[in-house]
Amino acid sequence: MVALTPLGIAALALLAERPMHPYEMYQLLIQRREDRVVKVRRGSLYHAVDRLLEQGLAAVRGTERAGNRPERTSYEITDAGRERLGGTIAELLATPVNEYPRFPLALGECHNLPRHEVIELLGARVALLQAELAEIEQLMASATARGVPRLYWVDVDYRATLLRTEISWLTATVADIASGDLPWLDSGAATFPHSPN
């Protein structure tokens, strides 16, 4: 059994809502800002739908033509697709997976840069994260005002919580670096201990 890609999961979840064609799926993913959590490109989405068909997780519903536009094929989720979607979501919810993000690697190696540069770079990161958080908070306020149940944007709430936590941690860490509470190699105050072999 081939694992579903994040885009495959998103496509299958859309088909679980109702039958649709890939262009409509693409528009919905962008409109719902799913591109924050899934890399969404039209060509990749069509390829993901093809893979769902090959695996028997989706089926052709029909073909339609509107005016002089090209024909569009609509797809629907199969019973196997519903089962696979549910199983995949359950596994992802229950089992933590190290996705090897790059930022912790950069943090682990930031001692290779001068202290002033790290302070500046982390400050720039905080500013970008604050801008993203402000945008997300506007989305959450808008969803609440429109009466959209939180269940449908709980992932956005999760992202906001992660952003708040990262901003708080980075702000404190930058302050520690700037004050010298976190000694820096270029200050001569910290040396890396050699481990005995």
Q: Which residues make up each language-model segment?
A:
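Amphipathic alpha-helical dimerization/coiled-coil segments
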Residues: 86-134
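Short, contiguous alpha-helical
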Residues: 160-179
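Non-transmembrane amphipathic alpha-helical segments
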Residues: 122, 129-143, 163, 170
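Basic helix-turn-helix/winged-helix DNA-binding cores
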Residues: 1-98
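DHp/HisKA dimerization-phosphoacceptor four-helix bundle of two-component histidine kinases
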Residues: 17, 47, 124, 158-165
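Long amphipathic alpha-helical coiled-coil segments
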Residues: 178-192
